[in-house]
């Protein structure tokens, strides 16, 4: 039985979603017995789709916002997801988050990062993305937003 690959919470430039199976196939035998260090996390496609390690798991990325999203999913998933569910997929929400330069705490930073990455074209956090193409009877980008927010609990449990 083929296991469905888990999508990362957001797209990143150079993301490894399509390569993740190949990368994982080339891990050493019994890799789950060892510590796992991910120095360039990005969207986390490899991390989310590999067999969980029983040892230490360390993720890192030069983009602090990326780490804050995974931290929120690990430490406060219910609060994080609840706040995201209240965010409407709209250009106004995107622009408001784009203007933010200071955050109350890491959770506020994580929400900002998630909104900017999921509501922008290609996850680049620069321009709002909107598609007239329909998916599930609604615009594609709106459908993708609702779908990923529903999948966040599973992503959060992936390697906790």
Where are these regions (language model features)?
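SAM-dependent nucleic-acid methyltransferase catalytic core
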Residues: 2-31, 74-159
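Conserved S-adenosyl-L-methionine
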Residues: 32-91
């Amino acid at each position: 039985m083929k296991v469905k690959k888990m999508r990362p919470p957001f797209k990143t430039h150079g993301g490894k979603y399509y390569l993740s199976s190949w990368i994982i196939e080339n891990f050493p035998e019994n890799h789950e017995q060892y510590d796992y260090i991910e120095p360039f996390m990005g969207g986390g496609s490899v991390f989310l789709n590999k067999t969980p390690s029983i040892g230490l798991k360390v993720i890192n990325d030069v983009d602090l916002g990326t780490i804050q999203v995974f931290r929120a999913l690990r430490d406060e998933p219910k609060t994080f997801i609840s706040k995201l569910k209240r965010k409407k997929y709209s250009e106004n929400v995107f622009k408001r988050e784009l203007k933010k330069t200071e955050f109350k705490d890491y959770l506020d930073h994580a929400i900002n990062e998630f909104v900017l990455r999921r509501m922008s074209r290609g996850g680049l956090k620069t321009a709002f993305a909107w598609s007239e193409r329909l998916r599930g009877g609604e615009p594609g980008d709106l459908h993708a937003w609702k779908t990923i927010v529903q999948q966040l609990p599973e992503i959060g449990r992936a390697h906790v």
